């Protein structure tokens, strides 16, 4: 997007640089309504996955939009009809992160990219909704216990 009229608007444009936290509440770059008119605006709650970036050598950035936003071409978006299923998919993908990085990322001469057809064919177990809720609650409890530790200097030793 080399047109200067496309930039400095108020519409978030998420890139892999923004995918550092589980929920995206803003982006470094914003585009104009003119630029957004030719792009899809994804609603809050959409899952985003980095599909092409050097970061895929070691991490699989996966986030949930906390705002309506556009995305760049290096990101894949998953809009699910059920917010609870979206949360389950988030944790399901994170659980398979080591496998995905090892088996489903290809290195080419310029940048790593996700073998998206193979990723899309990957099966993630989906238990009954009541079991999903129980597992997600347990994960959140564990994450809440770990959060204070991450700011403790002894934790990073």
Where do the protein language model's features map onto the residues?
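Short, conserved charged micro-motifs
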Residues: 83-88, 133
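A short glycine-rich beta-alpha junction/loop motif
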Residues: 68-76, 87, 107-126
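Amphipathic alpha-helical coiled-coil/heptad-repeat segments
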Residues: 98-99, 117, 121-157
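Short beta-alpha junctions and helix-cap segments that line functional grooves
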Residues: 1-2, 60-64, 74, 110
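Sequence-specific dsDNA recognition surfaces
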Residues: 1-3, 15-44
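Short coil/turn segments at secondary-structure boundaries
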Residues: 1-6, 104-106
